[in-house]
């Protein structure tokens, strides 16, 4: 009995690190600013069949309507209530999406904005996405309800009331982040309001949460909220399942607050990952892909089982957040596919793929002055995600997750799940290769000259279809064929001018 109690306690403590994806599904995709009706369709027609594990959705709760500038993406990070009512859709549409996605094995992860409410400068009676009244100047949010008692104004010690130094952890947690009204999460009432919101989402069927701005909350306050959360809905999850938690903590080193302070609550976003990988793939600062042999903890990252990793996210793809100019995005499509391919092949961390929309960038003194622009819309109404005949998306939705190279690497990761990093090869420069046990092998040529080498793949002999240049269709291949000898070796040739300078084969791409 003692052993059983120990094990059940252990299971409970560690459950928040488990992504709660359906068995065999290993990645999630952030469908940034998509409507719930479009996400439901995408789960059924694409994400389910293509092996995606889940979707990170934009904040589903009511936010302030920002008109200057006109309907920026960041208005959704300015809550006014916990009603499920935004530009992405209403509560019924949200419920329908969660049900339909779960029914095809695709989980929903909610971006939970719980550190703050909207900015203090908004006028009383200002527009909101569901019509709820608020008076931010007086700290009145009757739709929750919150009042002046529920904010940290008295706790913050800076003259401005805002964060003035990131070297002071008290300021970072107790003062206002860019003027956003900072909730007093040490109050049980505030914790209960937030937990009620998250529990409603859990009961609807979501699988977990991205905790926005976690760095700006005390880890113990987050834990107190998480301790109030229900188990996941048994319609789709085993009894006793706990929500997957990943906390947004930007920690590139050199600040008072470290990611490790948050490990007790769940996983943490590893922002060093995309920043460093971008530097390597761009060949900046003398970096080379040959240096990636000990990628992961060997590069000073957090432990793999605590990390949520990504090449770019909605913030840093537009110069916000962390990582700076090295971050690769869909605007740098060729190198971006290399970086995402590397991420999805490598065992480190739990992987998230980005799915973006295009906007009219306008750089002034190196800064995109249009970084605020919201999703494709007609007079503020988010446009439908249309699907073109070639399976790409229309209406300025980028849909990186539908790019063959990325979609097929999501499947590759599923196939090699649990297999060790193996058969590393490097030319000392930017040609590298590695395998995952006997289930998969990938080769990159990021040099300015041809790659031509015979490499040990670790795979059984036979003919394989490269899933980067094409697809296995029936028993034929629309891309490059790779011939693996009985000893596991294969000859690879990759031109430095290839559209995609990498090749990937796996157990399920064998012809």
UniProtKB/Swiss-Prot annotation:
Highest taxon of the lineage: Eukaryota
Listed cofactors: Ca(2+); chloride
EC number: 3.2.1.1
CC terms in the record's Gene Ontology section: extracellular space
Positions of Ca(2+) binding: 115, 173, 182, 216
Coiled-coil residue spans: none
Catalytic activity: Endohydrolysis of (1->4)-alpha-D-glucosidic linkages in polysaccharides containing three or more (1->4)-alpha-linked D-glucose units
CC cofactor note: Binds 1 Ca(2+) ion per subunit. Binds 1 Cl(-) ion per subunit.
Entry annotation: catalytic residues: 212 (nucleophile), 248 (proton donor)
PTM sites of type Pyrrolidone carboxylic acid: 16
Listed Pfam families: Alpha-amylase (PF00128), Alpha-amylase_C (PF02806)
Entry keyword annotation includes Secreted: yes
Keyword Lipoprotein attached: no
Compartments where located: Secreted, Extracellular space
Residues that hold chloride according to the record: 210, 313, 352
UniProt record, GO biological process: carbohydrate catabolic process; carbohydrate metabolic process
Miscellaneous comment text of the record: The two forms of this enzyme, I and II, show very similar activities, molecular masses, and compositions and differ only in their isoelectric points. As no evidence for two variants were in the cDNA library of PubMed:10082956, it is most likely that isoform I (PPAI) and isoform II (PPAII) are two forms of the same protein.
Protein name in the entry: Pancreatic alpha-amylase
Gene name of the record: AMY2
